[in-house]
Curated annotation (Swiss-Prot):
Residues 1-25 are annotated as: Disordered. Belongs to the universal ribosomal protein uS15 family. This is Small ribosomal subunit protein uS15. It holds the Pfam family Ribosomal_S15. The keyword Transmembrane does not apply. GO terms for molecular function: rRNA binding; structural constituent of ribosome. Part of the 30S ribosomal subunit. Forms a bridge to the 50S subunit in the 70S ribosome, contacting the 23S rRNA. It comes from the Bacteria.
Amino acid sequence: MSLDTTEKQQLINTHQTHGTDTGSAEVQVAMLSERINRLSRHLQNNIHDFSSRQGLLKMIGRRKRLLSYMRSKSEQRYADTIAKLGIRG
C-alpha cells in the first residue's frame, strides 16, 4: 500500500509548485490520493481487513483537511488540484 521512491518522486515532479517543492499541500494531497486509491483496491479484495479500513478513513480525513486548507488559501490552486487528480466529481 505504500509508495516506492520512484512513484513518490514521479508524483512530486507532477504536482510540485517549484523546483525544490516536496511538501506543499498539492504534493501531499496527490500522495494521499494515490495511497487512498491503492488501499481502496486492497479493501475490495480483503473485505474483513478492518485495521486497513480505519487507516483509509484517517487518510481520507487528512486529505479532506488539506483540501479545506487549500480552498481557504487559494480557490484557484484548489480547483487545479481537484481537476488534475480527478477527485470530487
